[in-house]
A protein has these predicted regions:
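Conserved catalytic core of Hanks-type protein kinase domains
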Residues: 13, 85, 98, 127
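Alpha-helical transmembrane segments and their membrane-interface exit regions
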Residues: 36-41, 86-93
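Active-site-proximal flexible loops/turns
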Residues: 22, 75, 81-82, 126, ...
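Alpha-helical transmembrane segments of multi-pass inner-membrane proteins
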Residues: 38, 62-70, 90, 106-144, ...
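Membrane-embedded glycan-lipid processing machinery
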Residues: 75-79, 83, 146-153
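Transmembrane signal-anchor hairpin modules in multi-pass inner-membrane enzymes, especially those
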Residues: 1-67, 73-80, 100-114
């Protein structure tokens, strides 16, 4: 399960499936598949814990998300939000249960830091020549960005800040 979690995290952070040159070459959605593989390993794991206070809060948030769409008259929006938010809930459950030892937490932190270093190297190249190896240009002519969820320079900066020890 832990290896699948690390591969999923690599796909979330490095995002090779979102590189413009590679978008059409991946036939299958790698990131959701890797999350499902990690979840299957978690299902067969003997240690499942749901006693952390974050679980009821997450469930409450999920319910409010659905009910708010229903009360706004858009029941289809509730169904759409299940599809968008369910992977977030699943990733939380898998990671919360899979990171049960200090050594695993340190390895995941190392993956975060190494991925941030890769994205920083991309930003350096992007700043020097105007475009990074992903094919993404500078945002607003001066701000580095990456692909996918890090297309917003502020989100990319938050990753960098989160990885500072």
């Amino acid at each position: 399960m832990f290896v699948a979690m690390m591969l999923y995290l690599l796909l979330v952070l490095i995002r090779p499936q979102d590189y413009p040159a590679l978008v059409d070459s991946f036939g299958l959605p790698l990131q959701p598949i890797m999350l499902i593989i990690a979840a299957v390993f978690w299902l067969f794991s003997p240690r499942k814990q749901f006693d952390a206070p974050q679980y009821p809060v997450l469930l409450l948030f999920f319910c409010v998300l659905l009910v708010s769409h229903v009360f706004n008259g858009w029941i289809g929006g509730a169904v759409e939000q299940v599809g968008k938010f369910a992977p977030v809930v699943l990733a939380f459950v898998v990671f919360a249960n899979g990171l049960d030892r200090r050594s695993r937490i340190l390895k995941i932190m190392a993956v975060f830091a190494l991925c941030a270093a890769v994205l920083a190297a991309h930003g350096i190249e992007q700043r020097q020549i105007g475009v990074g190896w992903t094919g993404i240009e500078l945002s607003q002519g001066t701000r580095i960005q990456y692909v996918g969820i890090f297309n917003d320079p502020n989100d990319l900066g938050m990753l960098f800040v989160a990885c500072i020890p």
